[in-house]
UniProtKB/Swiss-Prot annotation:
Cited function: This protein binds to the 23S rRNA, and is important in its secondary structure. It is located near the subunit interface in the base of the L7/L12 stalk, and near the tRNA binding site of the peptidyltransferase center.
Keyword terms, alphabetized: Ribonucleoprotein, Ribosomal protein, RNA-binding, rRNA-binding
SUPFAM superfamilies membership: Ribosomal protein L6
Phylogenetic placement of the source organism: Bacteria, Pseudomonadati, Nitrospirota, Thermodesulfovibrionia, Thermodesulfovibrionales
Organism expressing this protein natively: Thermodesulfovibrio yellowstonii (strain ATCC 51303 / DSM 11347 / YP87)
Any one GO molecular-function label of the UniProt entry: structural constituent of ribosome
Protein name as catalogued: Large ribosomal subunit protein uL6
GO cellular component: cytosolic large ribosomal subunit
PANTHER family given in the database record: 60S/50S RIBOSOMAL PROTEIN L6/L9 (PTHR11655), LARGE RIBOSOMAL SUBUNIT PROTEIN UL6M (PTHR11655:SF14)
GO BP terms: cytoplasmic translation
Gene (name only): rplF
Stated family: Belongs to the universal ribosomal protein uL6 family.
Amino acid sequence: MSRIGRKPIQIPDNVNVTVENRQIIVKGPKGQLSYSLPEGIGITIDNKTMLITRESDLSKQRALHGLARSLISNMVTGVSQGFTKALQIYGVGYRAQVSGNKIILNIGYSHPVEFVLPEGIKATVDEKQTTITLHGIDKQLVGQIAANLRAIRPPDAYKGKGIRYTDEVLKLKPGKTGKK
């Protein structure tokens, strides 16, 4: 049996979980998320504890068992606490600004790059305009938006200029060695 799928999910007091026709709806103080259960995967809720079960031991169902448990656990965490992802901008003159639901990036191109944030994602920029912090309740969406922002100007291998995650460690390449 999947070891991840076997773990019970604890439901906080401020989160409400309902199941209707294989559709799980999780409501909390930060918002609401829903997930459609795959075929062969079941759910039992009792006394602020959720347990995910599967009908058979087929390899596809074993894989979906752990996946469903992780996704539902992330939904519960998202609506109660939320998720954040921070990006750091490195480079002389590189900076970011937030205006409404747009992030305006000056990152070495001849024009400022405008990145439109989807609904449910908020962004903040620090005073130095070099750290972008994304906030949201959907872990997958927060991570995808962070990856899309990083892809606009990935870190350079020689100088390290560009957009990277705050916890990302770059191994810089050595430059050319001159003739003597």
